[in-house]
Amino acid sequence: MDRLRQDLIDLMLIPGLSGHETRVAAAIRASLAAIGVPTRTDRLGNVVASFAGVTDALGTAAPAVMVFAHMDQLGFVVRKIEADGLLRVERLGGLAERAMAAQAVLVCGRDGDLPGVIMTKAHHATTPDEKSVSYTHLTLPTNREV
């Protein structure tokens, strides 16, 4: 059970924003290949694998079972990079705004991944124009890294 739990944690830590699940799919294919299970990827990016059937002591075949799971995660899309390295992001999925403050995130870019932290502006310091905008602030150590 510990290995199953760790495998699940490892999969959940792989970035897989909706529409960008290739890293998760590659990890699943690699894990299955390591135990000799052939896989294929369909045109939508789904990983498909088949396991040999089993029979009981009386020779009765077990029923076929399909396991289906999402590979994607909730996340953000970068809408603007400010001169000081601040990223303005828009939520992708049903993330509750109140739950995001001070959360550690991974910003995935063409040249690699960078750690970031979601920050929010105090309500009394937010201008009326900013209150209606559906993005959150995210900052990285320097704008050079962005």
Give residue ranges: language-model regions.
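N-terminal hydrophobic/helix-forming segments and targeting peptides
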Residues: M1-L138, T142-R144
